[in-house]
Amino acid sequence: MSEMTKTPTHYRLLSTLKAMGPYLREGQCSERFYLFDCLASCVNDKKSPEKREFWGWWMELTQNEQEMSACYHIGRYTLAGDWVAEAIPESAQAEVNHTQAEFHKKLVKTLRERFEISVTVSTESAPFA
């Protein structure tokens, strides 16, 4: 590990992941486990904002020594504030895939440069472009 790279404690990781953008669900994170999500596309934008559901993705990031495992899921974010795994309609797929792929690139780069940690995608992960 280089002199500039700090030991990846939970709080250093949390601070770094939080700085990456709005996707981290900080209140649902714990030691060695981090939850992210993205509301990429509105299910029905004709509804008033408080009644909207969204298509998107969520990801569970688990720390194992000098490696992180990312498990992505795709689906619908409900009015109740829960994710439901289901197929994304074709009209929303491009936006969901784009946000997921761009976030993953940024995650890999950030963890590699800041902590020399690699990120692997879990075999149970939903595929993305």
Swiss-Prot record:
It holds the Pfam family Crl. Residues 99-119 are annotated as: Essential for activity. Its main location: cytoplasm. Keywords: Activator, Cytoplasm, Transcription, Transcription regulation. It comes from the Bacteria. It is found in: Cytoplasm. One of its GO terms (biological process) is positive regulation of DNA-templated transcription. InterPro entries: Tscrpt_reg_Crl, Tscrpt_reg_Crl_sf. One of its GO terms (cellular component) is cytoplasm. The keyword Transcription applies. Binds to the sigma-S subunit of RNA polymerase, activating expression of sigma-S-regulated genes. Stimulates RNA polymerase holoenzyme formation and may bind to several other sigma factors, such as sigma-70 and sigma-32. NCBIfam families: PRK10984.1. HAMAP family: Crl (MF_01178). Belongs to the Crl family. This is Sigma factor-binding protein Crl. It comes from Vibrio cholerae serotype O1 (strain ATCC 39315 / El Tor Inaba N16961). The lineage of its organism: Bacteria, Pseudomonadati, Pseudomonadota, Gammaproteobacteria, Vibrionales.
